[in-house]
Amino acid sequence: KVKPVSFTEEELNLINNIYEEGKSGPDMWKESSLKAIRNKISRVTLTNQQCYCAFCEGRLEKGTTAIEHIVPKGRHREFTYEPENLVSACGRCNSKAVKGEKETLIEPLNPIYSLNRFKIVHPVLDEPDEHIVFKDEDRSWKIEEVI
């Protein structure tokens, strides 16, 4: 289970101001006035995850790490800066080929992020070991069972 980033009151005010502008999730994520917050998210998630990808648990190297939005920011702008929606991921797990813009939420949607139901094992809200068994075979892993 990954510990989420936390924001100061000042950071929350900056984020809320951007939400109120009505921009799309991808545009909010690129907002220049929030660059310091994105840098903080990157540092904190990397530290909290002990430099491991939130999904494949591969080792993360500086420069190859990306911030992953578990619920895609392009589908659900309201969760673009939601702390529980942000984790560090390796380039492979964060690639369009692997993740794309797939829906990860099960309807009906709840505006309170943690009260939603997810189609995936959520690295922040769930305990992955309760849902997935990893087998190390020739330096690769397989998901044996997903509940």
Q: What are the residue ranges of the model-derived segments?
A:
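Short, charged surface segments at domain edges that flank catalytic/cofactor-binding sites
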Residues: 9-52, 76-80
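Short Cys/His-rich metal-coordination motifs, predominantly Zn2+-binding knuckles/fingers
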Residues: 56, 93, 128
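Histidine-centered nuclease catalytic patch
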Residues: 55-88, 96-112
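Short, well-ordered loop/turn elements at secondary-structure boundaries
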Residues: 48-50, 83-84, 126-128
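Domain-exit/linker segments immediately C-terminal to small folded modules
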Residues: 96-147
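Class I S-adenosyl-L-methionine
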Residues: 1-28, 62, 103-108, 121-124
